[in-house]
Every structure is written in structure tokens, then in C-alpha cells.
Amino acid sequence: MPDITFNGPAGRIEGKYFQAKDPRAPIAVVMHPHPLHGGTMNTKVTYRIYEAFAKCGFSVLRFNFRGVGNSQGEYDNGVGELSDAAAALDWLHAQHPSTSGIWISGFSFGSWIALQLLMRRPDVARFLAVSPPAGMYDFSFLSPCPASGFVMVGDNDEITPSSDIEDLLKKTARQKDVKIHYSKIMGADHFYTEQQEELANKLTQYIMSNLEKAPALSA
């Protein structure tokens, strides 16, 4: 997984990149939790998402938002971070112009950014949102949700109560044929401290079971 840098709106962005052997492999971008609360691309859950995509044959990129690690710039309350995410997806897609499909994903704050990017990129086929902070941020932009995806939370999450996510999903309108799969891991806190393997297994299972269902990009 080589270290890479690419240009973002606030300067250089650092990332970790896994390249699949198949040039038509699907691609995925992974976004980390809140930069001001210790979130980085090396956060355990962020890495687990990245690893799950790689094991499923994706070319995948995780990166540090502006002001984190060696990424240039300063925290921008989600606005600049969304621009960073768009730049990351553009970079990855440029490496794989023949990709069979695009997925985006994130953990906590990163899932809020990922879902905003989903609304701006009709070429995204599916999403993974791990512990989206539904009670802390406005997710009303998600209605109607344009793509199918997977939402996961721990039932002991002290930051994102599962009830907040369940309320969000009930209120979220969906376009025709869009399905959002919801999974709750019993006993898990926000960081899945004792449930890392279960988290990884559920992510991998969802990805593998939906690979063929993601619409292929037109040539």
C-alpha cells in the first residue's frame, strides 16, 4: 500500500493507495473521522474499511483531510473536507478510467462527508457509512438517497446512538430501487473496540454480496 500525494484545494493531500491487478476493478475512497478529535486515515475503523475493500478486489484510497498528518491546509468545518474528498475521488478515478464501479465510504464524521459527496456524484454506485453521526450533523440533504448502501452502528455507541440512525433512516426518502441495508453490532461502542473482527466481517460480506449489483459505468 504505497504512500501517495495528490493536489487538493488547500494544497497537497497524503494518502494510502492499494491498486488491484485488474484495471477494471471497482474503486473506493475511505474517509476518516473528525480531524479535531484525533481522526486520521490510520484510525482503526478507517483502516478496517480500507482493508475490506482491498480484500474484495477493489483499488482503494484512504487519505488525510486538510490539516491532518502531512496534508496541507486547516480544518474547514466540513466544507473544505468535502472538497478534499472530491479531489481524492477525482485522483483515484483518473488512475482507473476503466473501472467497473465507484463506491465511497466513511467512518463517523467521514461518513457525513462521504454521503454529501454521494449527492454530488451521480457516478457513485454504492456507499458504506459506519457510525454516521446523525444526532450531531444535518443529514437532510440525503433525501432522496440516490444510491444503495450499508449503514452500520454499535448498539452501545456513546457518540452516535443507534436510535438516531434509525430515526434518520425512517425519514430518508429513497429513489426507486435504492435499498439501504442497516446493521447493528451488539455491545459495540463508537470505535468498535472489542468488535473489530465482526466489523470487518460484516463489511466484507456486504461488499462481496453486492459487487455484481452495482451498475457498471458506461465506457
Model regions: which residues?
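Gly/Ala-rich beta-loop-alpha elbow adjacent to hydrolase catalytic centers
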Residues: 106-114
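Short alpha-helix in the alpha/beta-hydrolase fold that links the catalytic acid
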Residues: 161-171
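Catalytic histidine-centered segment of alpha/beta-hydrolase-like enzymes
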Residues: 73, 188-200
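Acidic catalytic loop of the alpha/beta-hydrolase fold
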Residues: 155-160, 190-191
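Short beta-strand/loop motif that positions the catalytic acidic residue
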Residues: 145-153, 157
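Alpha/beta-hydrolase fold nucleophile elbow
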Residues: 96-107
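Catalytic histidine neighborhood in serine/cysteine hydrolases
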Residues: 172-191
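Serine-hydrolase catalytic machinery in alpha/beta-hydrolase-like enzymes
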Residues: 6-96
